[in-house]
Amino acid sequence: MSKVIGIDLGTTNSAVAVLEGGQPKIITNPEGARTTPSVVSFKNGEIQVGEVAKRQAITNPDTIASIKRHIGEAGYKVTVGDKSYTPQEVSAMILQYIKKFAEDYLGEEVTEAVITVPAYFNDSQRQATKDAGKIAGLDVKRIINEPTASALAYGLDKTETDEKVLVYDLGGGTFDVSVLELGDGVFQVLSTNGDTRLGGDDFDEAIMNWLVENFKSDNGIDLSKDKMAMQRLKDAAEKAKKDLSGVTSTQISLPFISAGENGPLHLEMTLSRTEFDRLTSDLVDRTKAPVMNALKDAGLDANEIDKVILNGGSTRIPAVQEAVKNWTGKEPDHSINPDEAVALGAAVQGGVISGDVKDVVLLDVTPLSLGIETMGGVFTKLIDRNTTIPTSKAQTFSTAADNQPAVDIHVLQGERPMAADNKTLGRFQLTDIPAAPRGVPQIEVKFDIDKNGIVNVSAKDLGTNKEQKITIKSNSGLSDEEIDRMMKEAQENEEADTKRKEEVDLKNDVDQLIFQTDKTLKELEGKVSDEELQKAKDAKEELVKAQQENNLEDMKTKRDALSEIVQELTVKLYQQAQEAQQAAGGAEGNATDAKTDDGTVDGDFEEVKDDKE
């Protein structure tokens, strides 16, 4: 069975890992980095992903970042030129890039993956993530929650002990907290909570707003209206945030950020950690309620938690670490890298699926309650939040009016008492109900949630056994046909990218060969015949002509022809050098013989061995 890779598809950064020798290992990207920016840019018809795309963000308006914040969002599209892309398509570009360099590392095709999502993602967001994987050419074997993945990475070699673990996961765009029980190889999620609109991006924004306000106060210019200046501010804010995890103050210096009446203006400000903590205290405080709710739902007090694991790059912020310590009474565990733990845990789950990891069982939960709308617009729950999945639950309902021929089933997810305040997952209708007084027909509504947290709902008239089913699709509205079309486009893009790379490699080869030929011909002057030199020069000129005309097929043919001629000449050069060396060696030998004839006597010697040996 081929390897099942584990992918942490993050808001700001993504990572990929694979199980090797029973241990998960991060796969580095082509730049040698262990994480890859979740950024996509479009330039001259080419799609670029990762660090190269992030570097263009200031100058290239066709750059997309933090697309995960919109995945599963109905109707949301990003327009680039004359084309629009759904969040699934953009996410698929990131996944496709990750898939490619994972294949390069493993030396084999990768078709299966485990992808992580924030624990508090709803059904639409989970389904959309799965769709993104499919578009990228991946069979997503399992969707698992990010905090659960972290716990898998932490607890893989600790299966002998029983521990209650709280995972605090503050990433680039989302926040989750989960409480798990670990023991005998079973990883059971007791509860989960979070905020899908809170993350490191918000901390960056707080610094950006502070910079904008101060610059406006000093210079009377509002930088928020200058797109290029704002991108520079964003980069500087992110860097300052990271710096303040290690130092107590940092200098933010952005020359030529704007221009005033008297010429260019420069931004020079010092941000202290104290000021940063003041600017972001409300963001840190927003994470407290989910922590307390997760503990409450798990039926535990903070003092019953054995370990606190921090996950996500934003947990490096000292104020965050201090707050978690105060709320839980525990010093957070730093044994796993917060940027890599999720991908490592996903790789462990991949190993469970492929059979490489034995005796590990993962029991996850549904993050939000599921139910239907009933009379009066009330949300009636069938499955409560934090129920272990996979699970199934049925409940019987009846008609609201006499002789009602059909019932509309409105499927919802959320915690609010009224249907209108919760997230609609789907609607379907059960028809042909026999005429009967109100309350007589028996309609059984059944919910099934699979191990990925994806929902199936059925409604059955118990009198006639007529049944209607629905698999809840992503609210992004992607049909199977659209997904197939996007898969095809993604494949075409990959083929086009491969072709472009081959073109660049060919041009580089040609440049290198022309340079090498000039150098070799100079060395060969006077050492080979003029006829041979001219043959090489003519072949080189033909290649230069093909290069100038940008004729790729001609370039290949002429490159191969010139390469062969140069190789033959180089071999000749080496042969000549060798012959000269041998001739010199022969002359030296003759000189030695002559010396011996002059009366030098060769002496015999006998090796004397030491008796002590």
Curated annotation (Swiss-Prot):
Q: Which InterPro entries match?
A: ATPase_NBD (IPR043129), Chaperone_DnaK (IPR012725), Heat_shock_70_CS (IPR018181), HSP70_C_sf (IPR029048), HSP70_peptide-bd_sf (IPR029047), Hsp_70_fam (IPR013126)
* Keyword field: ATP-binding, Chaperone, Nucleotide-binding, Phosphoprotein, Stress response
Q: What does this protein do?
A: Acts as a chaperone.
Question: For the region Disordered, what residue ranges are annotated?
Answer: 577-613
Q: Name one GO molecular function term.
A: ATP binding
Q: Which cysteines are joined by disulfide bonds?
A: none
Expression is induced as follows:
By stress conditions e.g. heat shock.
Question: Mind telling me what this protein is named?
Answer: Chaperone protein DnaK
Which residues in this protein are found as Phosphothreonine?
T174
| CDD domains per record | ASKHA_NBD_HSP70_DnaK-like
